[in-house]
Amino acid sequence: MTTISDEELYTGLHAFVFIKEVDPGRNIADVVDEIADPERFSSENGQVLFASVAVGSYIGFAHVRAEEGDLAALQRFIYQDLWAKGVGCEHAVEGPVYTTMGANAQPKGPKRKSPPFCALVRVRTDDDPVAVMREIARRFGDTDPFQGASVTFGRADLLVELAGDTLDAVSEPVLSAIREAPGVIWTDTAFIYSGPWRTPS
């Protein structure tokens, strides 16, 4: 797995890749393993910070990064490099990242580091996305299972990450905290288990 510096986590141009399909005959798990491994997949256009299979409205997810402001490189990374690996996807550019409140304010964006069970919740809002993001974080008190959130430029306005030690720990709050937040008009959730899950061959 890629070793990512703390600086890379919150600098540069970030995007979230929602993998809808892979080339016929390929297995999504094999594709994800390949793009997540810097020894098997590297590009001068960008890098994969995290990738996993997912269960929900898409079959895989990747968090990718290009150099600051280099949209051309990001497009090459998605439409040439990832496409060549068989990745058919929807995507969103990451905007403002949620920042914790208080004296030691820190950025807290989705899919940086988290426990094994994860819910990635795409949120559409009819209000100010930054205000809705802050309200969702407030409902969790900046604590687990809330891991982070970002404004996104794509089909949804926000991406929120919940993570915990069980599936219930991340699925129940989608219904009780996120969907009930003022300004939320729809959510779209996929789940990721980042522990070992494949049957040994």
Please provide the spans of the model-predicted regions.
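A compositional/biophysical signature of low hydrophobicity enriched in polar/charged and small residues
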Residues: 1-201
